[in-house]
Amino acid sequence: MASKEAELEALLYAAGDDGLETENLLQLLEISPAALRELANHLKDRLKNDENSGLQLICINQTYKLTTSPKCGDIISKFFQKDLSKNLSQSALEILSIIAYRQPITRVEIDDLRGVNSAGALQTLVWRGLIKVDGKKDVPGHPNLYVTTDYFLQYFNYESLADLPVIEEFEADDNPVNLFNQDDSRNKEINFDEGE
């Protein structure tokens, strides 16, 4: 008879990319939440410390998954013909952060925030699996709504969107600033005399 840890590993393997939610695992394994955490931590450590294992155990949004280990990233990348180790461009990172903090959001809303077209970088992010289309906005034209994926959380090592760093909100100052105040000694008259 298999151990509970072996059963957990087999269930997660069988579940594939979708993984299994905590509640499902508790029912299937017939164990307590504390016992599941202990099993999961032991399995995670065993996979991490086994130099012959190409797998890792992760938990994202209360869903446990077996995934390939980052130490095997090069060969997996070669297999999928996607260079996942390649850095994202500055514009892609900017778009990704906008989506992460404002999701669901349309391309036009992203373009308005950035002031430039974002279509190309959006396609790159979709192709890399970091964002996805999650429905349509109920406005004329019914544009796609973009959200981050579980792979986004995995890629940046977050368990949920609540783990994202908090960004201070900047409120617009209602009082306009006069950049060329006459009383400001820094705004001296410049003399363009010839020969100087």
UniProtKB/Swiss-Prot annotation:
Keywords: Cell cycle, Cell division, Chromosome partition, Cytoplasm. Its main location: cytoplasm. Coiled coil: none annotated. GO terms for biological process: cell division; chromosome separation; DNA replication. This is Segregation and condensation protein B. It comes from the Bacteria. One of its GO terms (cellular component) is cytoplasm. It comes from Lactobacillus johnsonii (strain CNCM I-12250 / La1 / NCC 533). The keyword Cell division applies. The lineage of its organism: Bacteria, Bacillati, Bacillota, Bacilli, Lactobacillales. Belongs to the ScpB family.
